[in-house]
Amino acid sequence: METTVGTLGENTTNTFTDFFSARDGSGAETSPLPFTFSYGDYDMPSDEEEDVTNSRTFFAAKIVIGMALVGIMLVCGIGNFIFITALARYKKLRNLTNLLIANLAISDFLVAIVCCPFEMDYYVVRQLSWEHGHVLCASVNYLRTVSLYVSTNALLAIAIDRYLAIVHPLRPRMKCQTAAGLIFLVWSVSILIAIPAAYFTTETVLVIVESQEKIFCGQIWPVDQQFYYRSYFLLVFGLEFVGPVIAMTLCYARVSRELWFKAVPGFQTEQIRRRLRCRRRTVLGLVCVLSAYVLCWAPFYGFTIVRDFFPSVFVKEKHYLTAFYVVECIAMSNSMINTLCFVTVRNNTSKYLKRILRLQWRASPSGSKASADLDLRTTGIPATEEVDCIRLK
């Protein structure tokens, strides 16, 4: 299911014989997806075309997509559930950075348990055919888009939080009301920006070969609104990729300068050295998260820019759709990296998994305090200095 679609000019009527042709319920042929169109704008040839879903290339891509979706469901579903449960169970884990990570965990968890099963059915089982109705088509696309923007905004908020904590340590930390407002902003901005994704998402019958049809599920913008689509895409590209990446890079560059290249005045006690090592590990982990985010999402945005602003590049490419879905799957896999970095790698999730399976939600009265302290020491999260470096601030 595509989350963005491109646009075509009026002079491209007869250039799509290698793509799917689409038609509405009345039988009027239209321009091929995934480019935007309005029904009846194009007079497509009715030649029988090859079903690309039967090619070896698509078969290989289907295996890759299936493995990625299974990985997302397992890693993001289980890992984020355990982290959210731990955060709800242990109050000492509820600092600002962990709360910001929780927003990212919630969004990835929802995608893993709600969106990925439908996408597995769409991509792998039915091979690019949607059979679940318009409402679910729009809902799944919308939820996945909101999750992407929540993840981006949460990562940006975490970077700013680390910048303020390390570069300006004497400034007071955020109050509960401010933190709640920041979390509300992360979600509200994401929900609002993603509204067009739901509004323009629809189902369209694709005629692959004679007597064979598939139902496309994705965004379809009318040709007469191509200017608005391009403007919307550039807005999203700037607000939810370029801007956050630049801001996060500047924050971590300034933090790195503070931690590695600035001399610490006075005598360095063991406590100070431990805190410095902890902060450096934190920043290295966050830089890895940022690098993974760029490497996973840059190909997706680059592919989309070429498709939407230079459509002739892909017009004659037989395996265009296969390539796009693979790029999209790589982008979605970024949620697994976030989960592994923030939740699994240094969060001792096996202990919490055993407790959940045994329904041991409460510690014994005599040892509750000691148990909570032990849990706090064994659940360090790379991005959270307050947890990794207990009592050092």
From Swiss-Prot:
Example of a GO cellular component annotation carried by this entry: plasma membrane
Keyword check for Transmembrane: yes
GO MF annotations in UniProt: G protein-coupled receptor activity; neuropeptide Y receptor activity
Glycosylation sites: 11
Keyword Nucleotidyltransferase: no
Cysteines paired by S-S bonds: 137-217
Cytoplasmic topology ranges: 84-98, 167-179, 254-282, 344-393
Transmembrane segments: 63-83, 99-119, 146-166, 180-200, 233-253, 283-303, 323-343
UniProt keyword annotations, A-Z: Cell membrane, Disulfide bond, G-protein coupled receptor, Glycoprotein, Membrane, Receptor, Transducer, Transmembrane, Transmembrane helix
InterPro entries tied to this protein: GPCR_Rhodpsn, GPCR_Rhodpsn_7TM, NPY_rcpt
Coiled-coil ranges per UniProt: none
Subcellular location: Cell membrane
Extracellular side: 1-62, 120-145, 201-232, 304-322
GO biological process: cellular response to hormone stimulus; circadian rhythm; G protein-coupled receptor signaling pathway; negative regulation of apoptotic process
Tissue: Widely expressed in peripheral tissues with the highest level in the spleen and moderate levels in the adipose tissues, thymus, lung, kidney, testis, uterus and small intestine.
Bilayer topology annotation: Multi-pass membrane protein
Family: Belongs to the G-protein coupled receptor 1 family.
Biological function: Receptor for prokineticin 1. Exclusively coupled to the G(q) subclass of heteromeric G proteins. Activation leads to mobilization of calcium, stimulation of phosphoinositide turnover and activation of p44/p42 mitogen-activated protein kinase. May play a role during early pregnancy.
Annotated protein name in UniProt: Prokineticin receptor 1
Organism: Rattus norvegicus (Rat)
The encoding gene: Prokr1
